[in-house]
Amino acid sequence: MNTFPSTNRSFFSSRWLLIVTVVLLFGLGFGIRLYQLTNLPLDFQPTRQLLSMLKARGMYDATNPPGIPDWQRQMAIQQWKTRADVEPSIVENIVAFTYRFTGEHFWIARIYSSLFWIIGGIFLFLLVRDLISVDGAVIATAYYLFFPYAVIASRSFQPDPFMVMSIISFWWTFQRWTKRPSWLWTVLAGLLGGLAILIKFSAAFFVIGAALGLGFGKFSWRDLIRKPQVWVMALLGILPAAAYLYDGLILNNFLRQQFGGRFFPSLLLSPINYINWESKAALAAGGLAVMFGLLGLFFVRQRSTRFFLYGLWGMYILYGLYFDYHIATHDYYQLPFIPIVAVSLAPLADWFLARLAELSAGRWLRIVAIVFLAFGLFSVLWDIRDTLKLVDYRPQAAMWAEIGDKLGHGSGVVALTQDYGQRLNYWGWQNAEIWPNSGDIDYHELRGASFNSSTNFARMTNGKNFFLVTDFQELSRQSDLKKSLSAFPVYAQGDGYIVYDLRNQPAP
């Protein structure tokens, strides 16, 4: 008997069909994320992934593993220690610990991130099943697992997949608490909400939004504030992040410089910024999916579910208004939006599959409908496979190692290079002072700073030996820098790089 909110006829009324479908979804969802497992992580947000890779390598090398030269161990630790810690390095610590048993393989992180996303999908299925229906849960989960951007982003080495998993698990446990306010659900919801916020402080928007929506959808505000369990949940949610902030801002002072540049009041009045925000949201979640998700709000029957979705959408808007620069420039800031759209699609999907179930009541018609749905899933998977196979980045490791050897792995290097020099750091074992790209210059000018290329060149190259260029597109955008470098002889050159010798006087 169907005990879930929907009263529609179920397309997945057969228990075996449902089991096979769910197992297939999660099996394929995990499998496609492991495709091209050992390809270098340069296909998605390489700057952020390399940051985590450098941290994990430094943590691992600090344990004195065998077979690593002392100079490399010291450099790895130094590269780790000099990286900013905006949030706790939880995932990096997990990966570094795993390196003790597997050796250093960056793709270990890809497996962990994929697992986090899959586990999040399990909680999403349970949540939507309880709020909408089994049919809605199947479609919401399929979207969450197989939207192309979600596949590529969810296997990246950064805290976001872990954060999204924790957010969704909080949604489910809090929803269970609203149905049965026991101390077990209280503690679980508080701990999972606290974990999500600790992983990344921005998760607070989606934890609070869900809690407010579900809470006010079920109880009055007077009932909520009178419940001791609510205060315990709030305390458990706040304490972990508060302790980290106290350590970083008061005790050890390593966070003071990390919270600037997140909010620009002027961008709130910029139409272009809102267009860029929409563009990033459409890239991450799909413009049509967002539209159908919004239309899905009209199909919600239960007050608690409706308020839950209102809370999520409302907090997403506040999240974007607060992170007004990053929401329009960093597409991975949209990752928590994917499960919001997934849940919002469920009511419309439930209605659609109910109509499909009525129209395919016969056995053969039902089989044909299943084949059509399977074809759609196969097509999406094949397109994702083609995308993942498109570029083989593995040869780049040898190029960066060659550059490091040419530069001698020492100091005295300035570089105009990709990802703030982190490819050079990781595969080339070479540190460098990084010349700003045009995006950085624009960002700092937005914050009120000014930039003079000639003055900056004289300051940064004073006492240096080499100037490395690997980002030639960026060099073409900075004509003043190009002119300054043309006065120096070329020290070394290869496929994808050129090194200028700063030790010699400029040519007359």
Question: Can you describe what each PLM-predicted range is?
Answer:
Residues F26, L124-F146, V164-M165, L184, ...:
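Transmembrane-helix signature of polytopic, membrane-embedded enzymes
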Residues G29, A140-L145, G193, I197, ...:
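Short helix- or helix-capping micro-motifs
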Residues F30-L34, A203, L348-L353, R363-D392, ...:
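Transmembrane alpha-helical segments
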Residues S52-A62, L195-L198, A204-F308, L312, ...:
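Transmembrane-lumen/periplasm boundary regions of multi-pass, lipid-linked membrane glycan transferases
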Residues I108-L131, S169-T173:
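Transmembrane-helix motifs of polytopic, lipid-linked glycan transferases
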Residues R129-D135, F170-T186, A196, V300:
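Membrane-interface transmembrane helices that cradle and orient dolichyl/undecaprenyl
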Residues Y149-F162:
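Short acidic/glycine- and proline-prone juxtamembrane loop motifs at membrane-interface regions
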Residues K389, G404-D442, N465-F472:
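Short periplasmic/luminal acceptor-recognition loop of GT-C membrane glycosyltransferases, typified by
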